[in-house]
Amino acid sequence: MNTAFEQYLNFVKNFAQLHKKAAEIPLGESNPKIDSPKTGPKVMICSPHPDDECVVGALPLRMQQEMDAEISNLAVTLGSNEDRKKGRLAELEKACETLNFNLLLPGESALDGVNLTTKKSNPELWSENAAAIVDILKTELPEILFFPHDNDYNSTHIGVHFLMMEAIANVQNEKADWQPTIIETEFWHMMEKPNLMVAVSDEDEARLIYALSAHTGEVERNPYHVNHPARMLDNVTRGAEVVGSQGGEAPECNFAMIYRCSKMKNGIAVPAWDGGKIIGVNDDIKSAIFS
């Protein structure tokens, strides 16, 4: 057998073994939240489900660390399983504590029916959901909002996109000077024309997985938290081309997350810049994105 092939075979076997072993790491632990005043921008992650704050939270985490940003996770829904909502909320609280994120709910048990079927067949419920989001946006007036792109496959992810766009436009009708930056995320389906790739340190990737493991009811069923690094590895290769340029060099990092950054003006999303930006582990987030 070819020596080089044997080395690659060992690499694949070791990778698979290490991945399998990672699923045995204890779940559900958390760190207590550190309450301290923030001097940076207000950032809101609008999560379709509990766990999305971890899945797409790399850039918010860097904003917290590098810009002293106040990060709030708006749990738009607690999932569709009524029997799991209390449990998922408890898990979400632990995950947010670990990431030092605030937790906001639009109502006692968040929202239901956040999808385009509801928008078409039950416009009254859709309007009630939009009004609940509008109230929170008016109170918080975040400068930066994260939510899924409009084709992220999952019906609730897509619903959250359109609900947020509608709510932001409604607030801007009353507060024209509020022009937040929106940063669209991807999970279930890659987005068209992303314009931002953010490198993630090993420590931050571990922190995101650690927080994700607090969603015990979900990861016990399917240990997808240990798949997260593989996705982030793939982002480095893919992002070099789709955010950078075809034939572009991959940045010097192990992990990265891909986003699309725009400014909301008069209810319309306008790309924040021409082309794409790649931000390395040691690059300054504030100057790279907001200058």
Residue spans of the language-model regions?
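Hydrophobic alpha-helical segments, principally membrane-spanning helices and signal/leader peptides
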Residues: 34-36, 186, 245
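Histidine- and/or cysteine-centered catalytic micro-motif in compact active-site loops
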Residues: 150-151, 187-188, 264
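A conserved mid-domain beta-alpha-beta active-site/ligand-binding segment of alpha/beta enzyme cores
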Residues: 189-249
